[in-house]
């Protein structure tokens, strides 16, 4: 039997995440929802995705995150051929960072 993650429960979770207004709210929500270990694991996976996007080697990523080569390979696969979520957020954050940096120079 195949498990599907797209259902009413996860739709509700996605709406809850979208309701968060700032990093402080997100931290509170994540801490109530997940264990410290789970949050740390997700943080490591996110760091790996960003490093893979910068073409940083698996060895370096493993050293900085502690993730296994298998997990890094999965993240790489999802970054390249997944639903596009990693790429969407990386690009959006990079665009936001660049626009914020250029605005600082105008002040």
Residue ranges and their predicted role:
Residues 89-107:
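Intrinsically disordered, low-complexity basic tails/linkers immediately adjacent to helix-turn-helix/homeobox/MYB/SANT
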Residues 60-65, 72:
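Short alpha-helical "recognition helix" segments of helix-turn-helix
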Residues 25-45:
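Short, Lys/Arg-enriched anionic-surface-contact patches
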Residues 20-24, 36, 55:
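Residues at alpha-helix boundaries and the short loops/turns that link adjacent helices
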Residues 76-79:
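DNA major-groove recognition helix of helix-turn-helix
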Residues 42-56:
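Short, amphipathic alpha-helical "recognition" segments used to contact nucleic acids or chromatin
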Residues 1-20:
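General nucleic-acid-binding
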């Amino acid at each position: 039997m195949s498990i599907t993650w797209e259902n009413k429960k996860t739709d509700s979770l996605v709406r809850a995440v979208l309701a968060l207004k700032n990093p402080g709210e997100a931290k509170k929500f994540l801490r109530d929802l997940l264990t410290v270990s789970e949050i740390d694991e997700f943080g490591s996976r996110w760091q790996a995705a960003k490093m893979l996007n910068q073409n940083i080697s698996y060895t370096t990523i493993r050293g900085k995150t502690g993730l296994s080569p298998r997990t890094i390979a999965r993240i790489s696969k999802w970054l390249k051929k997944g639903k596009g979520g990693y790429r969407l957020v990386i690009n959006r954050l990079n665009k936001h960072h660049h626009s914020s940096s250029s605005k600082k120079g105008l002040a």
